C-alpha cells in the first residue's frame, strides 16, 4: 500500500533545512513569507535581535477581496517593500518558508523586487 504524504510536515522539514542556511542580520534582514489558504503574510526580521522590523499581510484594510490569490500576493509584496524602504532597509535575504518558488510566493517576491528591495 501507499503511504499518504503529509504536505504540511514536508513543508516544515524543508523550511527547517532552509532556515539552517538563511539568516537575517540588522544590515541584511530576512524577508519571511507564510501563506494560508485564504491569506498571505510577509515580514522582515532581524534574527540576531529576534525583532520583526516590518510586516504586511492580506488581512490589512487595503485588501478587500484580493486575499490569498496572486493579485493579493503582489500587493503584499509591494506593501512590505514600501514599508521596508521607508525604514531604510533595501537589501534582504528571501526566506520562502519551505514553499516552492511558484505561484503566490513568486508573485510576492517579484513585486517586492520591482518595488525596490534587493535580494
Swiss-Prot record:
One GO cellular component term noted in the UniProt record for this chain: cytosolic large ribosomal subunit
Any one GO molecular-function label of the UniProt entry: 5S rRNA binding
GO biological process, one term: translation
Source domain of life: Bacteria
rRNA-binding is among the record's keywords: yes
UniProt-listed SUPFAM superfamilies: Translational machinery components
UniProtKB keywords: Ribonucleoprotein, Ribosomal protein, RNA-binding, rRNA-binding
A family per Pfam: Ribosomal_L18p
Keyword Cytoplasm: no
Known role: This is one of the proteins that bind and probably mediate the attachment of the 5S RNA into the large ribosomal subunit, where it forms part of the central protuberance.
Subunit annotation: Part of the 50S ribosomal subunit; part of the 5S rRNA/L5/L18/L25 subcomplex. Contacts the 5S and 23S rRNAs.
Similarity comment text for this entry: Belongs to the universal ribosomal protein uL18 family.
Protein name (record): Large ribosomal subunit protein uL18
Source organism of the structure: Clostridium beijerinckii (strain ATCC 51743 / NCIMB 8052) (Clostridium acetobutylicum)
Lineage start: Bacteria, Bacillati, Bacillota, Clostridia, Eubacteriales
